[in-house]
């Protein structure tokens, strides 16, 4: 098949949508399909290139920077200190790239590629252009929704009274995108239920819960290389609470920082390792500096390549306090690495973390609850080993090979339905 994967967010950005889109393209290419990814350019200039590692085609659309949000590629600039307060940046030189008026370029690359099917990942400007082309040329569409409206509205820092109506409006907007396609997927059953709560009302298109999946072999449990500790200044033989992911407001990492202050009082050699970068970092630094814990906290920034699996293996427990996860690729990576996990009872993480099995589910926004559950694991080596094995076992059902097989079946079903209609 000739498959197009379109997204407004793509590698080298590091987030769930970007990682999944590239993994999907690479996996489909490896299975013999001809694949093109369409996404905004990171330089602003239009180009068509080959992925340097996997060899599929990437069409980079002309783009403009939005300077109120960082690009998730470069290091977020350090916050300014103002009379002891750390102030976050309000203007980012390396802003997020967005392709607003991109239909002519989309038409150009798709005319040349002649796709059999298009699979969109984000309800943004690139999708609008791709949908327009698909409708005009009668090309079947598949859509995947990766986000809750909360993921976006929290970035806007809206007053509380405005959040509910805007979330409702954005929910309808997300649903409208799914309805334009012929088949839709979301990463979990919970994500489907939250976006489409009215089961009695028939939905226009089939919607299936299908895991994003990960390459399990990349994160298989093992001992980290000694060099990784020195390279990232990670202490050896100490309890390490690990977080990997964006350091942005909707991830609720202030709760994890507060929880760590409580863990450190009872476990004085405990360390917090945060892999990732984002706009919430100044707030975390302030919390941890006030608690005099800066020496026990390690902000590693963005880590990619072979170092990332090694860093997972340094951890004692993986902690994620976000309430807005539609699945969480980093949680699956942690599980595949054999880490017990502490998450919160919100979003869809309960489909990955089973309470008292491979970790614990704490109360949302409750640092005391998060701290108690972290301490249960690091204070009990036997429990930690038991939960480690359970994490690996539960991760196995999320191998990306299962996702790729089902996605191929969906594409074939959609194409077969089109042929029957002719």
Language model features by range: what are they?
Residues 355-356, 360-367, 376-382:
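Conserved acidic donor-binding segment of nucleotide-sugar-dependent glycosyltransferases
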Residues 323:
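Aromatic "clamp/platform" in nucleotide-sugar-dependent glycosyltransferases that forms part
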Residues 283-303:
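Nucleotide-activated donor-binding/catalytic signature segment of Leloir-type glycosyltransferases, i.e.
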Residues 1-62, 405-408, 412, 419-422:
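N-terminal subdomain of nucleotide-sugar transferases
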Residues 110, 178, 302-303, 310-315:
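Short alpha-helical donor nucleotide-sugar binding micro-motif in glycosyltransferases
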Residues 39, 59-62, 164-225:
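Donor nucleotide-sugar binding/catalytic pocket of nucleotide-sugar-dependent glycosyltransferases
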Residues 340-343:
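Short hydrophobic beta-strand element within catalytic cores of glycosyltransferases
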Residues 19, 239-262, 272, 279-285, ...:
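A conserved mid-protein helix/loop that constitutes part of the nucleotide-sugar donor-binding site
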């Amino acid at each position: 098949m000739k498959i197009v994967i379109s997204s407004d967010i793509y590698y080298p950005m590091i987030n769930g949508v970007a990682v999944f889109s590239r993994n999907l393209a690479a996996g489909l290419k490896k299975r013999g399909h001809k694949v093109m990814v369409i996404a905004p350019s990171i330089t602003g200039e239009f180009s068509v290139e080959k992925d340097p590692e996997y060899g599929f085609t990437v069409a980079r659309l002309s783009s403009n920077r939005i300077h109120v949000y960082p690009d998730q590629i470069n290091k977020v600039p350090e916050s300014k200190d103002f009379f002891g307060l750390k102030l976050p940046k309000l203007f980012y030189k390396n802003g997020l790239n967005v392709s607003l008026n991109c239909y002519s370029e989309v038409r150009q690359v798709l005319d040349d590629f002649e796709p059999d099917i298009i699979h969109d990942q984000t309800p943004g400007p690139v999708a609008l252009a791709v949908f327009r082309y698909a409708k005009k040329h009668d090309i079947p569409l598949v859509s995947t929704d990766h986000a809750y409206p909360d993921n976006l509205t929290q970035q806007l820092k809206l007053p509380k009274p405005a959040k509910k109506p805007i979330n409702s409006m954005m929910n309808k907007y997300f649903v409208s995108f799914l309805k334009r396609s012929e088949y839709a997927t979301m990463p979990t059953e919970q994500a489907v239920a939250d976006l489409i709560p009215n089961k009695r009302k028939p939905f226009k298109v089939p919607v299936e819960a299908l895991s994003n999946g990960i390459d399990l072999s990349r994160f298989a449990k093992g001992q980290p290389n000694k060099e990784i500790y020195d390279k990232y200044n990670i202490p050896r033989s100490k309890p390490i609470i690990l977080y990997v992911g964006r350091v942005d407001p909707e991830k609720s990492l202030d709760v994890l920082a507060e929880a760590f202050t409580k863990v450190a009082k009872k476990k004085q050699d405990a360390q917090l390792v945060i892999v990732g970068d984002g706009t919430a970092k100044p707030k975390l630094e302030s919390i941890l500096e006030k608690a005099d814990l800066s020496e026990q906290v390690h902000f590693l920034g963005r880590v990619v390549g072979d170092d990332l699996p090694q860093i997972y293996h340094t951890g004692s427990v993986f902690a994620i306090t976000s309430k807005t996860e539609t699945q969480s690729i980093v949680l699956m990576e942690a599980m595949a690495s054999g880490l017990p996990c502490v998450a919160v009872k919100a979003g869809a993480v309960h489909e990955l973390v089973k309470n008292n099995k491979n970790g614990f589910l704490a109360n949302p926004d409750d640092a005391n609850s998060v701290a108690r559950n972290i301490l249960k694991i690091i204070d009990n080596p036997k429990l930690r080993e038991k939960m480690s094995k359970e994490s690996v076992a539960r991760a196995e059902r999320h191998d990306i090979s299962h996702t790729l097989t089902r996605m191929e079946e969906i594409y074939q079903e959609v194409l077969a339905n089109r042929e029957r209609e002719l």
